[in-house]
């Protein structure tokens, strides 16, 4: 089971890393369909290469989500926001439970304002405490794009990321980074 989770985390990380260096995907990505052979096709009928699965990133900004409709649209996973204005995202519980009930794999992310390793460890504690009773099957992600980090050196940012990821991995989850 642990190998399957690690493989899923590695796959998701690879997909997200590939996405980061790939050209921007047009808005019509929402209309992707699968052809008879199981490949995704664009709105113009061309086969899209490198697409392994579809997922969404949601938080309080999307408000009420029809998770059955999401699953019916060939979405296989959801990355759920955990925090908004230093409190639990008001839609976190509803989103995790709804996504899981619809059969989606669930991961979570935390938009971090950490500027020290102690703050990153506190962020990890916040997330780990929040998710302990939920069916998390995809990575626990640290989102490191806050303006507060702009003045930090690459070494300081790496230390922050490593502090968060170490705590998450020690707790039995697979850490990942959004940038």
Language model features with spans:
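Substrate-binding cleft of extracellular glycoside hydrolase catalytic domains
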Residues: 35-42, 46-172
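Sec-dependent N-terminal signal peptides
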Residues: 5-20
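N-terminal secretory signal peptides that target proteins for export/translocation
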Residues: 1-3
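Hydrophobic alpha-helix-in-membranes signature
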Residues: 22-25, 138, 174
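Aromatic-lined carbohydrate-recognition surfaces of secreted/lumenal glycan-active proteins
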Residues: 171-179
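Sec-dependent signal peptide cleavage junction
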Residues: 18-32
């Amino acid at each position: 089971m642990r190998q399957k989770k690690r493989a899923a985390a590695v796959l998701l990380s690879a997909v997200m890393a590939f996405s980061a260096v790939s050209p921007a995907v047009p808005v019509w990505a929402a209309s992707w369909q699968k052809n008879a052979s199981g490949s995704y096709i664009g709105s113009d009928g061309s086969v899209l290469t490198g697409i392994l699965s579809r997922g969404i990133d949601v938080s309080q900004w999307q408000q009420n989500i029809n998770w059955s409709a999401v699953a019916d649209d060939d979405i296989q996973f959801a990355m759920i926001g955990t925090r908004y204005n230093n409190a639990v995202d008001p839609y976190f519980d509803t989103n995790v439970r709804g996504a899981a009930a619809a059969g989606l794999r669930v991961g979570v992310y935390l938009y971090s304002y950490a500027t020290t390793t102690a703050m990153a460890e506190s962020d990890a504690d916040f997330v780990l405490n929040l998710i302990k009773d939920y069916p998390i099957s995809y990575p626990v992600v640290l989102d490191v794009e806050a303006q507060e980090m702009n003045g930090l050196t690459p070494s300081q940012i790496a230390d922050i990321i490593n502090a968060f990821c170490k705590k998450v991995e020690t707790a039995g989850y697979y850490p990942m980074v959004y940038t």
